[in-house]
A protein has these predicted regions:
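Glycine-rich helix-loop "coupling/hinge" segments at transmembrane-helix boundaries
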Residues: 80, 177-203
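Short glycine/proline-centered loop/turn elements that form peptide/ligand docking sites
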Residues: 129-133
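Short coil/turn motifs that cap or connect alpha-helices
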Residues: 54, 142-144
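Glycine/proline-centered hinge or cleavage motifs at structural transition points of membrane proteins
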Residues: 140-141, 154
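Membrane-water interface segments at the C-terminal ends of transmembrane alpha-helices
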Residues: 1-6, 15-127, 151-176, 199, ...
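Short, Lys/Arg-enriched, Gly/Pro-containing loop segments at transmembrane-helix junctions
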Residues: 232-236
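Hydrophobic transmembrane alpha-helix segments characteristic of membrane transport
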Residues: 9-10
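The alpha-helix within a helix-turn-helix
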Residues: 137
Length: 236
């Protein structure tokens, strides 16, 4: 990729209106997915790791399913669910909620595909916490929220940070489900991955390479920073 296009072409494409809008849309949606994953994912990971309830195995399997299921299939399921011909999609339409072929649809598709990486990693990190620490907190009559905030969260920070980095990178690189749910509307739903595909198929190989380089650079930089902050050791 580095030697496939001149830096002049790369910079020209990045600074163009289309290239800039594509990059900004991808960053905004992937960051929104990270925030949504934190809000939803931590409680789910906590429940799966420490609570016992009927249907736990089913919920656990459903959460892990998008990891192994083709993104196109995930996107197709969401497309059918949100379609106005479906009762749920019709209800959303009556409420004025537009998800299909919109940036919100991008966030939804990326969330379903990427959030399991965080939930799975956070769940395993929480489950690895020594039970005597949790028992001590319970003996002191600490609430579940206090235990989560002051015992669980600090101890699973490294694993959660890694999972969050994986989620962000997966959301940023998502293509199949996004294309099914949001389509390709330039300036509205054209993410970097969709732009890479469309440019390559239409003969704009240099523009496709330029966008791919930006995607690789963003992914490498953020993953590197997050893992260093998590205290991981790396070979340089």
């Amino acid at each position: 990729l580095v030697g496939a296009a001149s830096w002049h072409d790369v910079l020209s494409h990045i600074l163009s209106t289309q290239g800039f809008n594509t990059i900004m849309l991808s960053l905004k949606t992937s960051i929104a997915v990270v925030v949504l994953t934190l809000i939803v994912g931590f409680p789910v990971a906590y429940i799966l790791a420490l609570k016992q309830f009927r249907g736990k195995a089913v919920l656990d399997t459903l959460i892990d399913l998008p990891i192994v299921m083709p993104p196109l299939v995930t996107g197709l399921c969401l497309l059918l669910l949100l379609n106005p011909s479906n009762p749920f999609g019709r209800l959303l339409q009556q409420w004025g909620i537009e998800l299909l072929f919109s940036p919100y649809g991008i966030v939804l598709a990326q969330f379903f595909v990427a959030s399991p990486f965080f939930i799975k990693t956070a769940r395993e990190s929480i489950a690895a916490i020594p039970s005597n620490l949790l028992s001590a907190s319970a003996t002191l009559k600490a609430s579940d929220f206090y235990t989560f905030r002051n015992v669980i969260l600090p101890l699973c920070r490294k694993g959660a940070s890694t999972g969050l980095a994986m989620t962000w990178a997966r959301a940023l690189g998502e293509f199949g489900a996004t294309a099914m749910v949001a389509g390709n509307i330039p300036g509205k739903t054209e993410t970097m991955t969709i732009a890479i595909y469309m440019e390559a198929m239409s003969g704009g190989l240099n523009r496709s390479i330029s966008t791919a380089l930006v995607l690789v650079l963003f992914s490498f930089t953020l993953l590197f920073i997050l893992k260093i902050q998590a205290g991981r050791q790396y070979e340089y």
